[in-house]
Amino acid sequence: MRTLKELERELQPRQHLWYFEYYTGNNVGLFMKMNRVIYSGQSDIQRIDIFENPDLGVVFALDGITMTTEKDEFMYHEMLAHVPMFLHPNPKKVLIIGGGDGGTLREVLKHDSVEKAILCEVDGLVIEAARKYLKQTSCGFDDPRAEIVIANGAEYVRKFKNEFDVIIIDSTDPTAGQGGHLFTEEFYQACYDALKEDGVFSAETEDPFYDIGWFKLAYRRISKVFPITRVYLGFMTTYPSGMWSYTFASKGIDPIKDFDPEKVRKFNKELKYYNEEVHVASFALPNFVKKELGLM
C-alpha cells in the first residue's frame, strides 16, 4: 500500500488529497481535506499518518482512525484526565496507558501534586512522531516528572501492586493496532490491583452510538472489577457521533458524592473544556444510554 506522501507527490495542480474515515458498519464516516501530508509511516503495529487540514490544523491518525486534531483534542484529553485527577485527594503517582500523542500526559502534569507520571505506549514510533510533529500535545514529554515506557500496557501494569493513585487508559480503538488488549476483564483487574486503596481509574470507552457494542462491553467488564463504576460523557467533534464516553471507576470514591468543586475553582492552570459544572453534568446520562447499560 502506498503512503500518503507517495500519493501527494502524484497530485496535479489544484488537486487535493482527502482523508476518509469510516465508522463502525462502513455506512457513515468523516472526511477531511489534506492541505499537506506531514508524515506517513508504518510501524510493526500500525500505520501512522499526520497531515494538515485548513480548519482543524494538524491531524493525527492511526490505521485510518482519527486520534487527535489540533482544534478539538483538548475536549477529549481534559475530560479523560481531569475527572479522575480532581477526584483523588492527592494524586502523586499516575500511570497512563496509551496516549502516545502526549495530550493526556500534558493535562495530568498540570496538577502540581504529581510527582511522577508514567506514560506506557506500545508503539515507539508514535512517540517519535508525536515528539517531532505533534508539539501541542507532546509538550510534557521532557517534564522531569514524566517517564515514557515503550511496552504493552496490558503486560506492564501487571508488574505493580498497590502502586498508583490514578490510572488512565487512553487507548486506541479496540479494532485498531493492539487496542483490544486494553478492553479485557483481565486487564481491568490488573489495573485494580495496581491502584492504591484510594486510587481512581478512568478509561475512554468509545462512543455510545455507533460503537455501542464495545461501549457496553467495556462498562460491563469494568463494573465486574470495580465496586464503583460510572459512565460519563463529553463532546468530541471529530470522533464518531460527536458524543464520547469515558468510564470512571474506583475502590471507594464516588465521582459525584466525593467531588469537591472548590478544588476546580481554585485550579490555576488553563482549562478550555473541563470545569466543576461540566464534571457534574457529564455523569447525567441520556435515557438511551441508561437503557443500553441496564440502568433503567
From Swiss-Prot:
Subcellular location: Cytoplasm
Cysteine disulfide links: none
Swiss-Prot/TrEMBL keywords: Cytoplasm, Polyamine biosynthesis, Spermidine biosynthesis, Transferase
Catalytic site positions: D170
UniProt xrefs under PROSITE patterns: PABS_1, PABS_2
Major enzyme class: transferase
GO molecular function, one term: agmatine aminopropyltransferase activity
Impact after mutating D101I: Reduces enzyme activity over 10000-fold
Regulation: Strongly inhibited by S-adenosyl-1,8-diamino-3-thiooctane.
Binding sites annotated in the UniProt record for spermidine: H77, D101, D170, S171, T172, D173
A GO BP annotation: spermidine biosynthetic process
Domain PABS: 16-251
Enzymatic reactions: S-adenosyl 3-(methylsulfanyl)propylamine + putrescine = S-methyl-5'-thioadenosine + spermidine + H(+)
Residues that coordinate or bind S-methyl-5'-thioadenosine: Q46, E121, N152, G153
HAMAP family: Spermidine_synth
PANTHER family found in the cross-reference section: SPERMIDINE SYNTHASE, SPERMIDINE/SPERMINE SYNTHASE
Subunit structure: Homotetramer.
NCBIfam families attached to this UniProt entry: MFS_SpdSyn, PRK00811.1, speE
Full protein name: Polyamine aminopropyltransferase
Gene (UniProt): speE
